């Protein structure tokens, strides 16, 4: 993490760092601020609405604003536009890929002009590795069942489509 963040900082890029644990986020915030001697805001569920907006505005709009923005996965996963980021880090994995994808999407919004690199950290031989395997299997299963996007719907025959959208008479 440090090596990649060194590169991010040296390039003048900005990064989002997501963690699912608020307590870990506080520890990480303290460490990152000491390590790079710069502000690293931490947005969690306990962040007030006004503080939250101030953090987002400073990260997004201030040329001298923070390069690193630490967010709890749940609090930072929805309703934010953070297109200033060109890197997204998932520090610890969440079992539900949709939650991680929503968080990653904070950087992929209308107005994004940067290429965004997504980094997911996994400790070898740990529960995280097992969670990652589960996530990949769930994603593969979802892909096999419904396909990618809306393409699966176009592959249905007319009879299958009619059956899908028709009401059933269950009064027998």
Feature-to-residue mapping (PLM):
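ASCE P-loop NTPase motor core, strongest for the SF2 helicase catalytic module
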Residues: 1-172
């Amino acid at each position: 993490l440090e090596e990649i963040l060194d590169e991010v900082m040296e390039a003048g890029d900005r990064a989002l760092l997501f963690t699912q644990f608020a307590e870990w986020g506080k520890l990480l915030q303290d460490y990152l601020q000491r390590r790079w001697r710069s502000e690293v805001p931490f947005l969690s569920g306990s962040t007030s609405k006004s503080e939250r907006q101030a953090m987002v505005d400073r990260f997004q709009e201030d040329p001298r604003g923070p390069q690193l923005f630490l967010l709890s996965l749940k609090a930072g996963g929805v309703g934010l536009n953070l297109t200033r980021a060109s890197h997204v880090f998932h520090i610890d994995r969440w079992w539900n890929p949709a939650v991680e994808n929503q968080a990653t999407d904070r950087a992929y919004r209308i107005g994004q002009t940067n290429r965004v690199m997504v980094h997911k950290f996994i400790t070898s031989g740990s529960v995280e590795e097992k969670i990652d395997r589960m996530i990949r299997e769930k994603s593969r299963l979802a892909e096999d069942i419904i396909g990618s996007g809306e393409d699966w719907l176009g592959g249905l025959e007319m009879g299958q489509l009619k059956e899908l959208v028709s009401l059933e008479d269950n009064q027998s």
